[in-house]
Design a protein with these regions (language model features):
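A shared catalytic/ligand-binding motif for oxyanion handling
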Residues: 1-169
Length: 169
């Protein structure tokens, strides 16, 4: 699929592999991390080998998160692939997820363009908060959505997919 539609960087949050590692195929490099004992909650980056020369990795010690750094012009780009628990998860698990993300944000140079990739299981609603969320958020804001919005405000982040209208699913 990455060849047919020319994807240079693909961040995947639904990986069912165990452990951490790297794989090489003909045209792509794969950097992955997953739990040691369960085949769930893993993530990976699939990178076209043409841009691999522009890639540096910071491999955090947590199994569910990865950070990829890419040299670019006029700015470098940092992509964080993060695991966030579902809305049914215990609060301690959600707290740990956000703490782990805070740790990754500290590793990110302030001059980099930052992209955080994940399904947040959050409904942020359509109220829109200037500089944080747009008016095209999903549904009515839930507790997880409020937590994400608060996190974005504290860290000066924007939930980009709420800034434009999505197709109905």
């Amino acid at each position: 699929m990455t060849v047919r539609i020319i994807i240079n960087i693909l961040s995947n949050s639904e990986l069912n592999w165990t452990g951490m590692g790297e794989l090489n195929s003909d045209d792509h490099y794969i950097n992955y991390c997953g739990q040691e004992s369960y085949r769930r909650n893993g993530g990976d980056f699939i990178i076209n080998k043409r841009i691999l020369i522009c890639t540096t990795w910071v491999q955090p010690p947590k199994w569910q998160n990865e950070l990829g750094s890419f040299q670019g012009k006029p700015f470098n780009i940092t992509v964080i692939q993060v695991f966030t628990p579902t809305t049914d998860a215990k609060e301690a698990e959600a707290d740990q997820s956000y703490e782990d993300l805070e740790d990754l944000l500290e590793l990110t140079p302030k001059t980099d363009v930052l992209l955080i990739s994940e399904d947040w299981y959050a409904k942020e609603g359509s109220q829109g908060i200037p500089g944080v969320t747009g008016k095209f958020g999903l549904g009515i804001q839930n507790e997880t959505g409020q937590r994400l919005t608060d996190f974005c405000q504290v860290n000066t982040l924007v939930t980009a997919n709420t800034l434009f209208q999505q197709h109905k699913r």
